[in-house]
Regions:
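Protein kinase-like catalytic core scaffold
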Residues: 88, 119, 136, 186, ...
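C-lobe/activation-segment region of protein kinase-like
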Residues: 202-291
């Protein structure tokens, strides 16, 4: 896990100024943190200091995140007086451009008014690391578990059917939601490690870094939706326990992921592109049932 202790709070950035956010990030001195927007405590951000305390226990249920994402308790101080402690996740990016893009995506997802809205972690700030990387700070919500960590818990035995159904349902609900939006997103890395659920088994979006707003009316872009489906199905079907037994069998994947998606293709895509997705799905079902 990355370590960020010793970073101080400086240079507040206004959340509404997202169009100029990239330039402001590049101006942020290395080794400094900037929070987005005004502080809810009613104190100017420039009067605050921050202390980060590593919380390795927050990584439970997020195995594939721990090498890239740091989890912390962030305590805000004013004149050396502690005001509030908040759980944070801090994720590094190679460039400020990708960091800013992800912030914009997270904000857009969380602003959507939808009866089945799936939320993601709210971005709270940016850190400019000493090595030149830019890291995004977001709220951390305990109890969110990635699907791959659920699989890992049963590697030495067998994955119970109800757990396998939960994984397939979570993947379907998440992908279908983002594909069905008026301005849809493709995930572009739809492995089970990037699907998650809350303690109430409600789908939760944990990684938006590769999300792209994609035009389903454009035949040249329709393949991105098909690749999302394909990536997810192969990710599920490739999971095996320590004895080499398949943990999510093809019949379950078809019943709880492919079939419900397939039943709504006519609503998801225009007629001239729906057939492309349907053909892709038929080939996919044949592949996994034959053990390809």
């Amino acid at each position: 896990m990355r370590q960020f202790e010793g970073y101080s709070l400086t240079t507040p950035i206004t959340i509404g100024d997202v169009h100029n956010l990239s330039k402001q990030v590049t101006r942020l001195p290395r080794g400094n943190i900037a929070l987005l927007g005004t502080d809810r405590l009613g104190i100017p951000l420039e009067q605050l200091d921050i202390e980060l305390t590593p919380r390795d226990d927050y990584a439970e249920g997020r195995r594939n995140s721990i090498n890239k994402v740091g989890f912390y308790d962030a305590t805000l101080y004013c004149s050396d007086i502690p005001l509030v402690t908040q759980p944070w996740a801090i994720k590094p990016y190679l460039t400020s451009r990708t960091a800013v893009k992800d912030i914009t995506t997270m904000q857009a997802i969380n602003s959507l008014q939808h009866p089945q809205a799936i939320r993601t972690f709210e971005p709270r700030g940016i850190a400019h690391l000493e090595n030149g990387e830019v890291a995004v700070i977001s709220d951390f919500i305990q109890g969110v578990r990635s699907c791959d960590s659920l699989v890992d818990a049963y590697r030495e035995t067998t994955l119970p059917e109800e757990k396998a159904r939960l994984i397939a349902h979570t993947a379907f609900s998440t992908m279908h939601y983002f594909h069905s939006l008026p301005e849809p997103y493709t995930m572009n890395d739809a492995q089970i490690k990037n699907f998650a659920f809350t303690i109430n088994t409600e789908p939760w979006c944990i990684d938006t870094e590769k999300f792209l707003s994609t035009d389903k009316d454009d035949p040249s872009s329709i393949g991105q939706f098909g690749r999302d489906i394909e990536c997810c199905v192969y990710s599920m079907s490739s999971q095996s326990n320590n004895d080499g037994q398949q943990m999510l069998i093809p019949e379950l994947i078809i019943e709880h992921f492919i079939k419900p998606y397939e039943e709504d293709i006519s609503n998801l895509f225009p007629r001239d592109t729906a057939s492309i997705i349907q053909t892709s799905i038929e080939n996919l079902k044949q592949d996994i049932t034959q053990g390809a």
